[in-house]
Amino acid sequence: MSGRNQIIGALTIGQSPRTDVIPEIQKFFGDAEILQAGALDGLSRAEIDALAPEAGSGDVLVSRLSDGSWATMAEAKLIPLLQRQAEALCASGAKLLVLLCTGKFPDVLRVGVPVVYPQRLLYAVVPVLSGGRRVGVVNPDAKQLEQSQRNWGDALENVFVMAANPYQQDTDWDAVAETLAEERVELVVLDCIGYTRKVKERIQEKTGKPVILPRTLLARVVGELL
C-alpha cells in the first residue's frame, strides 16, 4: 500500500471527530486521507446513558464525546453500533480501519478491509519490552481495574493497575506518577487512546521510566502499511 491516495477509516467508540487524537498522529500516515466515525455519533445523551455497563455485563469502556465530556459503556452494547459505522467508513472508501480504543475486543467487525485493534499490538509488544519486570498499567476508570488486572495478568508476570481519567481536566498526573514510582514499576502503559503525548512526557519525566502511549504506537505501526 502507498500512503498517497490511501483512505484510512478511524473508528472511535465515542463520538467523532477525535480532535484530541487525530492531529497528534496524522503525521505518521503521510498523504493518506483519514475519515472518522464514532459508535455514538448522532445519539442523544439519554441513548448514550443507556449503554452504561451493568453488573456482570462484561468489559467496561470509556471514551470521549464531541463536547469534551466522556461516557462509560458496556462493550457488548457497542458492537452493533461499531459494525454500522465500520460499514459506513468502508462505503466511503476506507481501505483500512483503525479502532481508536485499546479495549480487548473479539474479532467482531465484519468488513472487507483489514481492521487494526490497538489492544493486540499492546499485548504483543509490552511483554517483550517488559522482560518480566514490573509493569504499571493506567486505565481511565476504576470500574475497569478488575478486567485490566485479569487481562494484563494473563500477558505479564508482574503488573500493577490503577485508574486516572484522561478526559478529566483536574486529573493530578504528578500524583499518578508518584503512585507508579511507589509501586516500583519499570515500564508504564497508558491503556487508552485518550492519553496524550503531554501526559506521557509528564509521567516519564516524573518516574524516570519508559511510557508506552497507545495512540502513537498504533500510528507508527499503521504507518508501516502505507
Predicted regions and their residues:
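N-terminal glycine-rich anion-binding loop in soluble enzyme alpha/beta folds
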Residues: 2-73, 139-170
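A short, flexible N-terminal coil/short beta segment enriched in small residues
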Residues: 5, 37-44, 78-86, 119-143
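Short hydrophobic/aromatic-enriched beta-strand-loop microsegments
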Residues: 32-37, 114-120, 156-163, 207-216
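Short, flexible loop segments at boundaries between secondary-structure elements
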Residues: 42, 131-132, 167-169, 211-226
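N-terminal glycine-rich phosphate/adenylate-binding segment common to multiple enzyme folds
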Residues: 72-119, 189-196
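A short, acidic, amphipathic alpha-helical segment used as a generic capping/interface helix at domain edges
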Residues: 82-85, 169-184
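Hydrophobic alpha-helical
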Residues: 96, 172-173, 186-207, 214, ...
